[in-house]
C-alpha cells in the first residue's frame, strides 16, 4: 500500500526534470511534494500513475513496478488511484453528478443508477457540498467549488491512493484554507495514502505528515514540518522565506471581512 520511487531520472530533450530521485510514501501517510513551479512535481505524479516512464530507476506502487505493467494490470492499478487535477478537469458538457460519476471505475457499479446516486451524494457530502450542486454545470461553479467537485470525483471510486496536483492553485487564501481543511478531513475519514503536489508551504505544513522539497531535479530535503523549518540547507531556507513573503502579500490582498470569515 506504499508508493516508492528509487533513483528515478527523467529528461525531455536537454531538460533534466528528475535526477536520481528517491521518494517514499508509507501506507495511509500524506506526503507533500513542495517546490517552485516548473521543477518536475507534476512529472513525478505522472510517473506514479504510469502516464510517464522513467529513463532510469524504479517506480513502485502497491507492490508493483509501474513501468513494467501491461495494459490490464495498469488499468487495475489506476482504478485504485484517485487523481485531483490542477484545473479540476471537469467536462463542461456534463453536470456535476455525471462528472463525479465518471470517478466510479467499477463497471457494474457505474451501470447501477441507484448506487451511483447514493455514491455521488456521499462524495458531495465528504467535500461539504449539498446534493443540489449535482444538477449544476461546471460553468455555474466558483473556482473553489470546481476544486471540491474535482476532489469528489477523485474519491468516487473509493481509491487506496490520492494524488493531488496543486489543489489550491489559483485560489485566494480563504478558499485555499477550505481545500486544505478538506484534505485533512478526508485523510481522517477515508484513510488513503496521499501525495500532495504544491508550491504552498503553509498548506503543505498543515496537511502533510512529511514534506519533500524538489529543487533542480533533485529531492533536496525530506522531513516533518519541524525538521524542514530547522534545516540549514540554504535552498530550503530560501524557499521558505520566499513563501512567507508571498503569504504576507496574499493576506494583504484579501478583504478584511474575508480574513475574519476564514479565521472563524
Predicted regions and their residues:
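ABC-type ATPase nucleotide-binding domains, specifically the catalytic core motifs of the NBD
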Residues: 94, 101-115, 126-127
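Catalytic Walker B motif of ABC-type/P-loop ATPase nucleotide-binding domains
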Residues: 162-165
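Conserved ABC ATPase "signature" region
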Residues: 64-65, 113-132
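Conserved ABC ATPase signature
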Residues: 137-141, 145
